[in-house]
């Protein structure tokens, strides 16, 4: 359908994402400090190096991570994975991360550079095999190790560590590349037992976003004591339903890493898989990870819309997720959303070619597809397909109103079971091409 230029322009009004999504204050987990600097790796001289440090000595820390499935895994991914395996997820007390250079597809020299970053931090904290390393930026270029080494020495030498809000925000800034705002989330939680704890998360990513996972780095830290196997299970569950449920452009990076540190600074019994609080913490961590992951989509390169894809009443969770992902990754769906075109045929097409594990999950005679308004306007739901029957005479004016919203929902009811999955995606604009066409310049 063709819509008026006035309506299209209304949707594309500039949004101050920094003001909307960056917190102005917050409380943070006990026993963590962070440091940051501008090492000079980034050409514009902005912050590009950060360190997260566990300072709690009351009990050993635990760590877990989920890494990219890209075959060209970057040196930091391979190195950090080895550290975690050797340490068995215990006594990991630091994370060092740089932006501006991904240290990916850099061969043996890249592996050595990643190890040097780890060794430098290990030496500063006086512990072996206690640091994870992460990098993000341009692929296929070697790190400027003279600048990185000087930067690490500067952070520790000048005691540039803090636990206040500005320190955490600046570390979040130090990992940004094409991001338009730093992604920082912090929340306090209370367990049924009465124990209160804090989760703080940072992420970077705006493009090359597609499971599993994206050109994204994510860090979640907590002062709750969690046994290492339980922490890994918790993070894997949360990632499956958060960072692996987002899409900007369908590209999967070589550097994707989500890690979680638990330092046990809260004086309470360690949580394991058999603990009564385990399921509660797992669900709280999942909801928290979803909030953090959604910020990545909201910052999608050149995007003007945040779109929730809800697939419900599926036979299996996995198939609900596969269909939601297929819709979210479709370039034709994303460009139609940008153009505010109610072309539901593209949504059905994406559902139809989804590679389901069980073909019984999809019955073309039972499917319902709708656009859902998120601004409390009525009617909230606009049916596009009802019980497999296309609604050929939909209200085009109402469709235009819903598609003009900055936030909207695509709802798919499969009618074959009781399982559901959510995906978060964005539209695809001309600006995306501009950003990525000029990325290395």
UniProtKB/Swiss-Prot annotation:
Presequence range in chain numbering: 1-8
Site feature Involved in the stabilization of negative charge on the oxyanion by the formation of the oxyanion hole, where: 136-137
One of the GO biological process terms: L-arginine biosynthetic process
Signal peptide: none
Function in brief: Catalyzes two activities which are involved in the cyclic version of arginine biosynthesis: the synthesis of acetylglutamate from glutamate and acetyl-CoA, and of ornithine by transacetylation between acetylornithine and glutamate.
HAMAP family: ArgJ
Protein name according to UniProt: Arginine biosynthesis bifunctional protein ArgJ, mitochondrial
The organism of origin for this protein: Saccharomyces cerevisiae (strain Lalvin EC1118 / Prise de mousse) (Baker's yeast)
Lineage, top ranks: Eukaryota, Fungi, Dikarya, Ascomycota, Saccharomycotina
UniProt gene name: ARG7
């Amino acid at each position: 359908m063709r819509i008026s230029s006035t309506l299209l322009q209304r949707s594309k009004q500039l949004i101050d994402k920094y003001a909307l999504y960056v917190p102005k204050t917050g409380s943070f987990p006990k026993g963590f400090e962070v440091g940051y600097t501008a090492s000079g790796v980034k050409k514009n001289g902005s912050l590009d190096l950060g360190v997260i440090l566990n300072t709690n000595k009351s009990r050993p820390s635990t760590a877990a991570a989920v890494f990219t499935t890209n075959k060209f895994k970057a040196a930091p991914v391979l190195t950090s994975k080895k550290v975690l395996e050797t340490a068995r997820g215990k006594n990991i007390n630091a994370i060092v991360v740089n932006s501006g250079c991904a240290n990916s597809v850099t061969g043996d020299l890249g592996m050595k550079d990643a190890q040097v970053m780890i060794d430098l931090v290990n030496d500063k904290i006086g512990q072996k095999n206690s640091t994870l390393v992460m990098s993000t930026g341009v692929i296929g270029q070697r790190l400027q190790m003279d600048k990185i080494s000087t930067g690490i020495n500067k952070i520790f030498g000048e005691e540039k560590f803090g636990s206040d809000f500005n320190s955490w925000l600046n570390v979040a800034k130090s990992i940004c590349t094409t991001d338009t705002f730093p992604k920082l989330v912090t929340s306090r939680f209370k367990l049924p037992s009465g124990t209160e704890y804090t989760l703080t998360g940072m992420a970077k990513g705006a493009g090359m976003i597609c499971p599993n996972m994206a050109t994204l780095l994510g860090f979640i830290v907590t002062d709750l004591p969690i046994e290492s196997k339980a922490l890994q299970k918790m993070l894997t569950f949360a990632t499956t339903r958060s960072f692996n449920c987002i899409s900007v452009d369908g590209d999967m990076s070589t550097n994707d890493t989500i890690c979680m540190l638990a330092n046990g600074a809260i004086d309470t019994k360690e949580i394991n898989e058999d603990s009564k609080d385990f399921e509660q913490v797992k669900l709280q961590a999942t909801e928290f990870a979803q909030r953090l992951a959604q910020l990545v989509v909201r910052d999608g390169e050149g995007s003007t819309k945040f779109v929730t894809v809800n697939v419900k009443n599926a036979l299996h969770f996995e198939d609900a997720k596969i269909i939601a992902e297929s819709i979210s990754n479709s370039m034709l769906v994303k460009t139609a959303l940008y153009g505010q075109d109610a072309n539901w045929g593209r949504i059905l097409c994406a559902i139809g070619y989804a590679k389901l594990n069980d073909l019984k999950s999809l019955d073309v005679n039972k499917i319902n597809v709708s656009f859902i308004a998120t601004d409390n306007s009525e009617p909230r739901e606009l049916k596009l397909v009802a019980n497999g029957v296309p609604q050929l005479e939909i209200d085009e004016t109402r469709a235009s109103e819903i598609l003009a919203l900055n936030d909207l929902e695509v709802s798919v009811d499969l009618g074959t079971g009781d399982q559901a999955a959510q995906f978060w995606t964005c539209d695809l604009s001309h600006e995306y091409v501009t950003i990525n066409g000029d990325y290395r310049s």
